[in-house]
């Protein structure tokens, strides 16, 4: 797997291209997920994303695929700019922090309505990020003091079904756990009939990867 951040880099002739767009609340873990996948390094400090584009090459069924991955800003200040990056999206990753019930609720309340408006018929994958923090006792206790709990795997599955996603995946960028699987699944969904026909399958079963 190779990665580049040069905006002008395009797929070589004969290589399929897939545009992946990550959306979700600011700080939910989508940027760390992308950086670990593309560069192999976890960012120890948080810097809010404006908009970033990465190019990554991988294999799908033995054939090269060129991923154009867009990381979008989740802050309200960028609501008018974000839709500029949706055209021609092949697959959407709706990301949330499993230790942030608010970011989880926003998948249904904010992000799904937005992408459904601007990207009709584009397949969706819901991604639960920061799974390593489910075992952070300090964070869990803080949530419990406010009457909250980390988002469970089962609730993530239910959310994916509720927005008609083709898959639900969980990952930990810090532990490099399941990171590659997220983007491998995105590429495979974008290139398969599973992705092309997903809007007809909202009430049917979907793939779950942990």
UniProtKB/Swiss-Prot annotation:
Outcome of substituting residue 207 to S: Abolishes endosomal localization
Ranges that cross the membrane: none
Pfam families: Ras
Membrane topology annotation: Lipid-anchor
Tissue expression summary: Heart, placenta, liver, skeletal muscle, and pancreas and, with weaker intensity, in several other tissues.
Cysteine methyl ester PTM positions: 207
Keywords noted in UniProt: Cell membrane, Endosome, GTP-binding, Lipoprotein, Membrane, Methylation, Nucleotide-binding, Prenylation
Nucleotide-binding is among the record's keywords: yes
Short motif Effector region, span: 46-54
Lipid attachment residues per UniProt (S-geranylgeranyl cysteine): 207
Biological process (GO), any one: lamellipodium assembly
Binding site for GTP: 24-31, 71-75, 129-132
Residue stretch(es) of the prosequence: 208-210
Main localization, broad class: membrane
GO MF term list: GTP binding; GTPase activity; guanyl-nucleotide exchange factor activity; protein kinase binding
Classification via InterPro entries: P-loop_NTPase (IPR027417), Small_GTP-bd (IPR005225), Small_GTPase (IPR001806), Small_GTPase_Rho (IPR003578)
Location relative to the cell: Cell membrane; Early endosome
GO cellular component: cell projection; cytosol; early endosome; endosome membrane; Golgi membrane; mitochondrial outer membrane; plasma membrane
Record PANTHER family: RHO FAMILY GTPASE
Role noted for this protein: Involved in endosome dynamics. May coordinate membrane transport with the function of the cytoskeleton. Involved in the internalization and trafficking of activated tyrosine kinase receptors such as PDGFRB. Participates in the reorganization of actin cytoskeleton; the function seems to involve WHAMM and includes regulation of filopodia formation and actin filament bundling. Can modulate the effect of DAPK3 in reorganization of actin cytoskeleton and focal adhesion dissolution.
Subunit-structure text: Interacts (in GTP-bound form) with DIAPH2 isoform 3, DAPK3, FILIP1 and WHAMM. Interacts with PAK5. Interacts (independent of GTP-loaded status) with ANKFY1.
Family membership: Belongs to the small GTPase superfamily. Rho family.
NCBIfam families noted in UniProt: small_GTP
Protein known as: Rho-related GTP-binding protein RhoD
């Amino acid at each position: 797997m190779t990665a580049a951040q040069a905006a002008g880099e395009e797929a070589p002739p004969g290589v399929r291209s897939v545009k992946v767009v990550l959306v979700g609340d600011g700080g939910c873990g989508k940027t760390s997920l992308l950086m670990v996948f593309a560069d192999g390094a976890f960012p120890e400090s948080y810097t809010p994303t404006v908009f970033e584009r990465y190019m990554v090459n991988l294999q799908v069924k033995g054939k090269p695929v060129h991923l154009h991955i867009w990381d979008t800003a989740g802050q309200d200040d960028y609501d008018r700019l974000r839709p500029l990056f949706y055209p021609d999206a092949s697959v959407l990753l709706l990301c949330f922090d499993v230790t942030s019930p608010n970011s989880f609720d926003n998948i249904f309340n904010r992000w799904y309505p937005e992408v459904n408006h601007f990207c009709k018929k584009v397949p969706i994958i819901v991604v639960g990020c920061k799974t390593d923090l489910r075992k952070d006792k300090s964070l869990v206790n803080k949530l419990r003091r406010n009457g909250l709990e980390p988002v469970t795997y089962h609730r993530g599955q239910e959310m994916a079904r509720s927005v008609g996603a083709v898959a639900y995946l969980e990952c930990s960028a810090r532990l490099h756990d399941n990171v590659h699987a997220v983007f491998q699944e995105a590429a495979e969904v974008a290139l398969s009939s599973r992705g092309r026909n997903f809007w007809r399958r909202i009430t049917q079963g979907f793939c779950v990867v942990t």
